[in-house]
């Protein structure tokens, strides 16, 4: 498979399983990455980021779509709703993907999924959002940070507005994975070298000599150091 419609079709299926069927995002995504482990790292990273970002920003994405669509998100077909969500996420948050490519691939995917009659609708909504994305204004912090208002209100009441907003921002930052090294199998330096050889970003922590923070990897099971214990 090549990056483009094939990767986006994988993303669409993953998000349908998560957002429409209630699947746990880390489990569904992990299973998909394991199934498609023959894809190159760039494609898997594209899949991971788009899936995770779309799930995290669903509340905000729905607000944007509703602002530029004649049909509200809740009334859309699941495939179209999901296709728009993942595409709008790319338009708003993935600068390396040209908006024109996002729109074109979404139209192709709508057609491939037998929604030929809605190609114009998908194209119109996405291009309208693309043209106006710099003028987007958020009505409140719930939409701005894509956090349910009841949670945000509870945190503000408990911790104060400034701390609550800081907590929400922290949730939206790219996450790192903490792993404990099995120093009976290899030295910490050997484990770090193995990880770096697979182009994983590795950070040490002063909190524990046996713990490493990992980022910019596909999934743990794909790492040699993880597979070797």
Language-model-derived ranges and their functions:
Residues 1-131, 138-141:
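Non-catalytic accessory regions of SAM-dependent methyltransferases
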């Amino acid at each position: 498979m090549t990056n483009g419609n094939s990767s986006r079709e994988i993303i669409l299926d993953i998000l349908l399983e998560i957002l429409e069927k209630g699947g746990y995002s880390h489990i569904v995504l992990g299973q998909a990455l394991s199934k498609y482990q023959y894809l190159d790292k760039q494609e898997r990273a594209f899949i991971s980021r788009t899936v995770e970002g779309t799930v995290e920003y669903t509340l905000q994405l729905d607000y944007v779509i509703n602002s530029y669509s004649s049909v509200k998100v809740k009334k859309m077909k699941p495939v179209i709703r999901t296709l728009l969500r993942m595409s709008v996420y790319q338009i708003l948050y993935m600068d390396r993907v040209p908006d024109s490519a996002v729109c074109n691939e979404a139209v192709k995917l709508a057609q491939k999924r037998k929604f030929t009659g809605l190609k114009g609708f998908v194209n119109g909504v996405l291009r309208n959002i693309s043209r106006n994305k710099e003028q987007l204004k958020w009505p409140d912090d719930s939409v701005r940070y894509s956090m349910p208002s009841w949670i945000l209100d509870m945190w503000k009441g408990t911790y104060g507005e400034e701390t609550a907003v800081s907590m929400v921002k922290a949730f939206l930052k790219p996450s790192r994975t903490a792993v404990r090294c099995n120093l009976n199998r290899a030295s910490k330096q050997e484990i770090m070298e193995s990880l770096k050889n697979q182009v994983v970003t590795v950070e040490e922590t002063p909190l524990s000599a046996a713990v490493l923070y990992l980022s910019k990897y596909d999934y743990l099971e794909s790492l040699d150091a993880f597979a070797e214990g």
